[in-house]
């Protein structure tokens, strides 16, 4: 029997104008967008719609903006009935809202705080990330270990699809890998426009603060399994999920294993909810036989609601 997973993108998918088509054109989406505006301590709708101050790319703003867009799309969709959900990094919080582990209002506060802690963890220029293209995980892991020392580290951070592994760590080592990448066998090594060494062990510095912050909110058992980035399997227990969301800060995103786990459970239809088609592109490189649907806009929502 066919099974469906709803999936949510992470940072990098944001763009100016995001969710503007939903606002005032769909009551359910407008409710989420208005709730975000009323919950947060900055003008999130201005940042998402026009970004006149150029702040959308700052992680403490990007994170609530993406969660809000995905959640607004989700609220507007009818007859979804997913069997599983999965998000990439930040996108996992949209999964938690979808599976009713967190209320949207609590989730948007949590990702705002997550972004602030991540931004404050290191001074600008200390940590960074890069995408390594054309090498498998074992080779990238080996290169990272050879470059790392007692006082500087570089580690695999996002295991996205065959031939695309994102690494994270001290900027000096990221720069060295970018420079040496081709000689080490990579097709390309592309530096990413991020302000810190996300999903590396360096992020353990914020573990305690983040853990104590999220403990003040109500976490519920998931209504359907959330496939978690840190262990690539479906979880429903609220305490396991919460613990894994803390570990997620400093652990690699196991996207290949997560996708393969879902396919092993019988999932043959992935519905990506949020801006862009990044995850659909990754899944195509993991398995070409599954069906992929992208829901990015009001028109996509209307198409789904009319056809389903």
Curated annotation (Swiss-Prot):
What would be one Pfam family of this protein? Answer: Acyl_transf_1
Output the InterPro entries linked to this UniProt entry: Ac_transferase_dom_sf (IPR001227), Acyl_transferase_dom (IPR014043), Acyl_Trfase/lysoPLipase (IPR016035), Mal-CoA-ACP_Trans/PKS_FabD (IPR050858), Malonyl_CoA-ACP_transAc (IPR024925), Malonyl_CoA-ACP_transAc_FabD (IPR004410), Malonyl_transacylase_ACP-bd (IPR016036)
Database matches in PANTHER family = MALONYL-COA-ACYL CARRIER PROTEIN TRANSACYLASE, MITOCHONDRIAL
A cellular component term, taken from the record's GO annotations: cytosol
Source domain of life is Bacteria
Enzyme Commission numbers on file: 2.3.1.39
Q: Output the lineage of the source organism.
A: Bacteria, Bacillati, Bacillota, Bacilli, Bacillales
Task: Look up keyword Protein biosynthesis and say if it applies.
Answer: no
Q: What protein is this chain from?
A: Malonyl CoA-acyl carrier protein transacylase
Q: Can the keyword Transferase be found in this entry's annotation?
A: yes
NCBIfam families for this protein = fabD
GO molecular function terms noted in the UniProt entry:
[acyl-carrier-protein] S-malonyltransferase activity
Q: Pathway listed for it?
A: Lipid metabolism; fatty acid biosynthesis
Provide the GO biological process annotations.
Answer: fatty acid biosynthetic process
Residues crossing the lipid bilayer are: none
Any idea which UniProt keywords this protein has? Answer: Acyltransferase, Fatty acid biosynthesis, Fatty acid metabolism, Lipid biosynthesis, Lipid metabolism, Transferase
Tell me the organism.
Staphylococcus aureus (strain COL)
Which reaction(s) does the protein catalyse, per the Swiss-Prot or TrEMBL entry? Answer: holo-[ACP] + malonyl-CoA = malonyl-[ACP] + CoA
User: Gene3D superfamilies from the entry?
Assistant: Malonyl-CoA ACP transacylase, ACP-binding, Malonyl-Coenzyme A Acyl Carrier Protein, domain 2
Residues of the active site are 89, 199
Protein family according to the UniProt entry: Belongs to the FabD family.
Which sequence ranges form a coiled-coil region, renumbered to this chain?
none
């Amino acid at each position: 029997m066919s099974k469906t997973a709803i999936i949510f993108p992470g940072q990098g998918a944001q763009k100016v104008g995001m969710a503007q088509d939903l606002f005032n054109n769909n009551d359910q989406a407008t409710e989420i967008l208005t709730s975000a505006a009323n919950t947060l301590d900055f003008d999130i709708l201005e940042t998402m719609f026009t970004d006149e101050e150029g702040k959308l790319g700052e992680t403490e703003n990007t994170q609530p903006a993406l969660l809000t867009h995905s959640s607004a799309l989700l609220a507007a969709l009818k007859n979804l009935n997913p069997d599983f959900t999965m998000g990439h990094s930040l996108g996992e919080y949209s999964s938690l809202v979808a599976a009713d582990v967190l209320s949207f209002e609590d989730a948007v506060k949590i990702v705002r705080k997550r972004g602030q802690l991540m931004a404050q963890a290191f001074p600008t220029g200390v940590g960074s990330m890069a995408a390594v293209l054309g090498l498998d995980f074992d080779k990238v892991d080996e290169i990272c270990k050879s470059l790392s020392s007692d006082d500087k580290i570089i580690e695999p951070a996002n295991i996205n699809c065959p031939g695309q592994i994102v690494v994270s760590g001290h900027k000096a080592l990221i720069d060295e890998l970018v420079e040496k990448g081709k000689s080490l066998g990579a097709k390309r090594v592309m530096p990413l426009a991020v302000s810190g060494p996300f999903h590396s062990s360096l992020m353990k510095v914020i573990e305690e603060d983040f853990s104590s912050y999220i403990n003040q909110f109500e976490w519920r058992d998931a209504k359907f399994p959330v496939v978690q980035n840190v262990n690539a399997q479906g979880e429903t227990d609220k305490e396991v999920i919460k613990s894994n969301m803390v570990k997620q800060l400093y652990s690699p995103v196991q996207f290949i294993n997560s996708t393969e786990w879902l396919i092993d459970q019988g999932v043959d239809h992935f519905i990506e909810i949020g801006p862009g088609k990044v995850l659909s592109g990754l899944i195509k490189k993991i398995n070409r036989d599954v069906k992929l649907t992208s829901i990015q806009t009001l028109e996509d929502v209307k198409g789904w609601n009319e056809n389903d």
